[in-house]
Amino acid sequence: MLYRYFLKVASIFTIMGLIFVPTSRQFVAAESYKELQEIDSYVLGQMKDLDIPGVAIGIVRGDQVVYTQGYGVADDAGRAMTSDTPFLIASLSKPITALGIMQLVEEGKINLDAPVQMYLPWFRVADEEVSSKITIRHLLHQTSGFDERESYVRNLSTDSSVEALEMSIRALNTAELNFAPGEAFEYTNTNYDILGLLIQTLSGQSYEQYIEEKIFDPLDMDQSYTSLEGARGGNMTRGYYPFFGITTAYDHLMPYSRIVKPSAGLFSSAEDLTHFLIAQLNQGQYQGNAILSEERIATLHTPGIQFSENAGYAMGWSVFSFPDMASVTPNNSIPIGLTHAGEWVGYTSLLVFIPELETGIVLLMNKHDPARMPEYFSIGWSLAMLAVGLEPLEPQSADFIGKNIRVLLAVVIVLLGIGAVWAVRKLRQLPSKSGSDSRQNQKLAIQMTLLAIVDLALAVGLLFIRLPESKDTIFLSLRFNPDIGLMYVLLLMFTLGWGTIRTLLFLRQSLKTNKLENAI
């Protein structure tokens, strides 16, 4: 969906080598009041700069929740945001699903290196031979070969039936893999939805029941939910989207379907997610309760594929070296940071933890803007910096086109509109031209040809460069980024639609003019 998750996080690390009022507070004496004021000031400043209605954060140190805080509002009525307010956490569902799978590994119910077909005998993709080679580990490491864009189409399903998850996985029998299992990395929800079905099949419970009983309950995640209805009952925040640059409540496109629950459909609060991070930082322990062994936690955190010497993907976690924190580690060593982000229309979320520094942060925001995601995610990493006594990062930005996509599209569409008016006027004059105006006719022919070239270049650039690079389609843009999608449609209407009509009219009028000249 939109900018791809890993590219957003990686961009941060490349650069690294209403008046909002705090509305809830909880902290222990591990932090000074001055440090907490700095955190509050930073978050409020970012909210103002990025026009974010509401934010909730949490900071963990060792086995303690150091600080939780809510800022701004949770809805248009001005309800105060708190650290207990539920959010749609989108892809933060993935590390939760990965934890569930690892619990089943510990119980001996599943083998990471076994093929999916061992547990789902009917499981198929288009290539039957390849079907038997996709393992559980491939799914966890996002190396199965499934296509990212196709998974976003599945996100739009509204099927909430008991059979929905299994039926969606059975429908993969026509899926073409982008590469052989284990050969490369491609982030896709499909992998984790299959894992969710495995949890459901091997546990004998629904995915939702398992997550609630085996993860939410032991971690005291009382404001975490596996259904939209439950989250709304817990007073979840509304989501906001910058519709043509105006922040607007826009959360109707929710994950109603059970199909995407394991990959992107869970709900939680900042307070609850600090409990989840404590278990990650403390070898699977939370308040004396072990939800997973130290060995299995280590497996979850170990990269299965490397993007570079300093970056890789583990099981539900991206793993990076964090050089900016070397000054606060023993022996000035460069610590490893683990992170995952979540995006949906109206919601942005981020988890970060640094095991060597025993520090973790939760960042939940009730706004999503595909043009500002690097800036959003850098807030989370800056909070991690502040939490260990360092200065926040310099503000991050998307690439020029990404950051200014709405303005650029609007300018192009206006220019195309002006060009359309000009072309209509010229075409109306063309039939009256006589032989003495042949030079003007030739000039107009050149102008029309140049317009056609510009139209073709814009259409090709959008359809074959911009959209494929962002793993997007016009249809998905209209659903997940409606204003940008609408401008894409207008651009294509002007270039391919009107451009074709204009060219045909010019050719017809030229023929009429030639006949008129011949008659004279």
Regions found by a protein language model. Give the residues of each.
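Active-site helix/loop module of the DD-peptidase/beta-lactamase fold
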Residues: 54, 88-92, 104-151, 174, ...
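Short, charged, amphipathic alpha-helices and their helix-cap/turn boundaries
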Residues: 38-39, 71, 79, 118, ...
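Short, conserved catalytic-motif segment at the N-terminal edge
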Residues: 32-89, 125, 173
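Catalytic loop of the DD-peptidase/beta-lactamase superfamily, centered on the K-T-G motif
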Residues: 29-55, 59-61, 212, 255-520
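Second-shell loop/turn segments in exported
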Residues: 29-32, 86-88, 124-128, 153-159, ...
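Hydrophobic secretory-pathway targeting helix
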Residues: 2-31
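Carbohydrate-binding/catalytic loop surfaces
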Residues: 231-255, 261-262, 318-320, 324
